[in-house]
């Protein structure tokens, strides 16, 4: 895992090389929606774009199971930390979201992206949805593409169980 430092919704800077030393899940997503604002038909036309909030809330809803397994959860997008913080508060997300606003991680690992038009200025680069399990400084497993997004957390827990981690009883999503 590269030593890339990303701003966190907890008000700190997180070095991905350091967090990858311990078991962690990073789920990467394009962007979460804005309250009271529809995404529009152009968003729906992008394969795999829709589902960021359900993916995030899936990890939120199963967060206790990850904690019980000793696995830390992080979400990553290219959105600004301020917007991510609003999302965390509004949706009661118990883990940190990390901002790759400057695309340091995206460029370092040549992550799959797409361009999306924004209201002001030119297009913005968004990360395609995926999830990683990291441990001992490296990415052990990648889920890409992720479908359906709301089941991503459950998929990760099932994989961890198949690897021999003691899987707590998991609620149905």
Predicted ranges, named:
Residues 1-173:
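Chalcogenol-based redox active-site neighborhoods
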């Amino acid at each position: 895992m590269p030593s890339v430092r990303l701003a966190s919704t907890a008000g700190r800077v997180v070095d991905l090389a350091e967090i990858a030393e311990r078991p962690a899940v990073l789920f990467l997503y394009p962007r979460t929606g804005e309250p009271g604002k529809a995404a529009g038909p152009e968003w729906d036309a992008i394969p795999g774009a829709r589902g960021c909030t359900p993916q995030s809330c899936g990890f939120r809803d199963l967060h206790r199971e990850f904690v019980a397994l000793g696995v830390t959860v992080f979400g990553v997008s290219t959105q600004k930390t301020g917007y991510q913080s609003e999302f965390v508060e509004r949706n009661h997300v118990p883990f940190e979201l990390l901002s790759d606003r400057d695309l340091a991680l995206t460029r370092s690992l040549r992550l799959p992206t797409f361009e999306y038009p924004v209201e002001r200025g030119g297009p913005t680069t968004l990360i395609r949805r995926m999830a990683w399990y990291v441990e001992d400084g490296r990415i052990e497993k990648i889920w890409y593409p992720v479908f359906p997004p709301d089941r991503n957390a459950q998929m990760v827990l099932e994989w961890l169980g198949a690897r021999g981690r003691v899987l707590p009883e998991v609620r149905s999503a």
